A protein has these predicted regions:
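Conserved AMP-binding/adenylate-forming core of the ANL superfamily
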Residues: 41-42, 58-90, 97, 101-103, ...
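Conserved AMP-binding A3 loop
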Residues: 70-72, 178-205
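Gly/Ser/Thr-rich phosphate-binding loop
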Residues: 266-271, 277-336, 349-350
Length: 509
């Protein structure tokens, strides 16, 4: 099911994938098969795409641990999965959990499930698979280890084992939902978002023309169980006929990631800011980033110091949410500034009087899945509030904060922390981050994430000038090095843990 590795020099003859124009035309034709309501699903839009781009082709190809699987073998393995799904009488809209790591088997199961019109719930491989099946009322799962209602996967050739029976379900099928994807939970409690064919294909059609993926070698680090990795990393690379070089460590080991990118002469990389910061901290990582032809940095705001480094590359800003499948905005290659989000793409956006960004368009999710309740459907033509505070300069969007970071002081005063933090970061772009918190409930303190050896950080007097009327409640201004700033996996601040540590430190002092 595999071939020898393609020439890493790029000089050997490589099978020619479809041209970018042809790929976009195929996507637009697939999108035209999707209705806005998704009711009474008709022709499956994925079948023609995969038939054109995988069957009997050499590219795309997936490379992991130096094993190369060309498109034709991806197709053959997917047909084995299709056969198994049909033997178990799975029908369009039956829900299955896909809980494999990024791999050849993951792609084969994904293609087969899309071909059959199943509803695919994407779950990290080490999650509670049985719990996910119960929460999502799924018929079964494809997982690493055997268990009730589970398939396991051969690395390259279809199922390794099949379930004895499928799980009985309580609710109805969901043929108009193609993916159930969990939000990251970094800004609010994680939710299962329902995405339709139209949602995903509209983002692919709007974004792929900008990604310059023809004859690309994509260094893949993002989890494919998250919508950023699925829709803006894996699927574009597959449809564009790219070589997908999968990092087994998922970007967590910058030295091995750099070596992998150098060995395969990678041309593209999409990642969260924290992965980029790790690469920049290595000896050869900066050179690798400068050699790349393209890629998206998204998932978390990019502070001024990192934006300055990214301006030396061809990487671009990307912004979105799981609820937007996930495309809302995209920047140009090498166009960076502190907290830059890009320009709206594939949807319409508006900024409310309070600075909150909202969007509407074909990317707006079709609902939210609730345990014991099923699918809470949403109108596809609605306006979706993001909870993100932004400022708009012409067509460009800049991140200012979150609406859900507000808190009340003990005297009842309402502090919109996200808005104030945005003002401070805009006024002092050398700051990596800012956190407003209430040390004891009566007043506010400001924590500044700043380089100890970098430019002079703003004085407390300068901070007070920006805070205006809130300055009368300011009782402290603490400076913290980036290495001590507590972050989540994508690079966003862990507000709860950071506030706890700051309060404990101030109490001890």
């Amino acid at each position: 099911m595999q071939t020898a590795p393609p020439s890493r020099s790029g000089s050997a003859a490589r099978p020619a994938p479809a041209s970018p124009r042809e790929t976009v035309e195929h996507l637009e034709a697939a999108l035209a098969k999707c209705s806005a309501t998704e009711a009474g699903a008709g022709e499956n839009p994925w079948r023609s795409l995969f038939y054109e781009h995988l069957r009997d082709e050499g590219l795309p190809a997936l490379v992991k641990n130096d094993a190369v699987t060309p498109a034709g073998s991806l197709w053959t393995g997917a047909r084995l999965w299709t056969k198994s799904f049909r033997e178990f009488s799975l029908q369009a809209g039956d829900r299955i959990v896909l809980a494999l790591p990024p791999s050849t088997a993951f792609v084969q199961v994904l293609v087969a499930a899309l071909w059959e019109g199943l509803t695919i719930a994407l779950v990290p491989p080490n999650d509670n698979i049985g719990g996910a099946c119960a929460a999502l009322d799924a018929r079964g799962a494809v997982a690493l280890k055997p268990g009730p209602f589970r398939w396991t996967a051969d690395p390259y050739a279809g199922p390794a084992s099949v379930p004895d029976v499928l799980r009985p379900t309580e609710g109805s099928r969901t043929p108009d939902v193609r993916f159930l994807v969990r939000t990251s939970g970094t800004t609010q409690r994680a939710r299962w978002i329902a995405l339709s064919d139209r949602n995903v294909l509209s983002v692919l059609a709007s974004h792929l023309p900008h990604l310059t993926l023809q004859r690309a070698r994509v260094l893949s680090v993002l989890p494919w169980s998250h919508v950023f990795g699925l829709v803006l990393d894996l699927l574009p690379a597959l449809l564009a006929g790219a070589e997908i070089i999968r990092d087994p460590a998922g970007g967590r080991d910058p030295a091995s990631l750099t070596a992998l990118g150098e060995a395969w002469k990678a041309t593209h990389l999409s990642a969260v800011p924290r992965t980029i910061q790790r690469l920049l901290a290595t000896e050869r990582g900066p050179a690798l980033l400068r050699r790349l032809h393209g890629g998206i940095v998204g998932g978390a705001p990019v502070a001024g110091p990192l934006a300055d480094r990214l301006a030396e590359t061809h990487l671009r800003a990307g912004y979105g949410q799981t609820e937007a499948a996930p495309g809302i905005a995209l920047g140009a290659p090498g166009e960076w500034a502190a907290h830059y989000m890009g320009r709206p793409l594939g949807c319409q956006v508006a900024v409310g009087a309070n600075g909150e960004l909202s969007f509407e368009g074909p990317n707006a999710c079709v609902g939210v899945w609730r345990r014991h309740e099923g699918l809470d459907r949403r109108s596809p033509n609605r306006t979706v509030r993001t909870g993100d505070l932004v400022r708009r300069e012409g067509a460009d969007l800049f991140f200012e904060g979150r609406t859900d970071t507000a808190f009340k002081l003990s005297n009842g005063r309402f502090v919109r922390a996200g808005a104030w933090e945005g003002r401070l970061k805009r006024q002092f772009p050398s700051l990596h981050d800012v956190l407003l918190f209430a040390p004891a409930g009566d007043d506010v303190s400001v924590a500044l994430c700043t380089d100890p050896s970098g430019p002079n950080s703003p004085s407390e007097t300068a901070i007070r000038e920006v805070l205006g009327p809130l300055a009368e409640r300011l009782v402290g201004c603490v400076r913290i090095a980036p290495t001590d700033w507590v972050r989540r996996g994508k690079g966003t601040v862990d507000r709860e843990e950071m506030t706890r540590r700051l309060r404990a430190s101030q109490s001890a002092n």
